[in-house]
Regions:
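Conserved Nudix-box catalytic region and its N-terminal flanking loop in Nudix hydrolases
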Residues: 2-6, 48-93, 135, 141-144, ...
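Nudix hydrolase/Nudix homology domain
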Residues: 2-7, 34, 108, 116-119, ...
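Acidic, metal-coordinating catalytic segment for phosphate/diphosphate chemistry
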Residues: 11-48, 54
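Active-site segment of metal-dependent pyrophosphate-handling enzymes
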Residues: 22, 44, 52-53, 65-67, ...
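Conserved hydrophobic/aromatic beta-strand scaffold that supports enzyme active sites
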Residues: 23-27, 50, 60, 125-127, ...
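Terminal peptide-recognition signature
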Residues: 26, 56, 95, 153
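Short, well-structured alpha-helical patches and their helix-loop capping segments
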Residues: 83, 87, 91, 114-118, ...
């Protein structure tokens, strides 16, 4: 059996560098020796927070997204664009800024890569429990000045995922993962009280600590901007 092919990069050209993304053109060696071009959108990465109340309700936001030209329902989130700031610190800050909550207990819920066919964007979704409402800070710029905070049962949010009302990829992943976690044996009561929402799927060992390894976290954009991730 032949060893797996190593897709070496023989050259790379930067085509655009913006505030949030960069575009580069890589020349990649394919099996058989042919070289082809691959467009890569570099992204700083982002964090998402699923704030879960003791009654199994979640806090979400309705926010305008210009590429879609409409408001969509999402979880609180933010870019990993602060030099030297670790992901959970960014997540804590975004939770306060976007929905006005502090959380006592944090864990990694799920990691995902958004569009690996053309982008290195990766997202880490945190589960935040033990919530205390402190209010959003005054101000807010651009789209954030218009966002609306909503609280709804997790079961209703999952229903909206399945009916196509919630389409944000990280929200879909986070909500379905939370549904699975709460259905796990012994885990639901320890997080949110006695009410479970489905059959057992996974156990408590599946939740990871906030500093769990994240091998797909992007670094190229941060390196380009002079802020290598911690």
């Amino acid at each position: 059996m032949n060893p797996p092919h190593e897709f070496a990069v023989s050259g790379s050209d930067t085509r655009y560098v913006g505030r949030v993304v960069a575009l580069r053109l890589d020349h990649v060696v394919m099996p058989g020796g042919r070289t082809t071009e691959r467009e890569v959108v570099e992204h700083p990465g982002s964090v998402v927070v699923l704030p879960l109340h003791d009654d199994a309700s979640v806090v979400m936001i309705d926010q305008y997204r210009h590429p879609l030209g409409r408001r969509i329902r999402e979880l609180p989130a933010g870019l990993l664009d602060a030099p030297g700031e670790d992901p959970v610190t960014t997540a804590r800050r975004e939770l306060v800024e976007e929905v006005g909550y502090l959380a006592r207990d944090w864990s990694v819920l799920v990691d995902l890569v958004a569009s690996p066919g053309f982008s290195d964007e990766a997202v880490r979704v945190f589960l935040a429990c033990g919530l205390t409402e402190v209010g959003r800070p005054p101000g807010g710029d651009d789209e954030e000045a218009d966002l609306h905070v909503v609280r709804l049962p997790l079961a209703e949010a999952v229903r909206q995922v399945l009916t196509g009302e919630i389409v944000n990829a990280s929200a879909v992943a986070g909500l379905l993962a939370a549904h699975a976690v709460l259905a796990g044996p012994g885990l639901g009561p320890s997080l949110i009280g006695p009410s479970l929402i489905g059959p057992s799927l996974i156990g408590p060992a599946e939740l990871r600590p906030v500093d769990a390894p994240w091998p797909d976290r992007p670094t190229r954009f941060a390196d380009r901007r002079g802020g290598t991730p911690p």
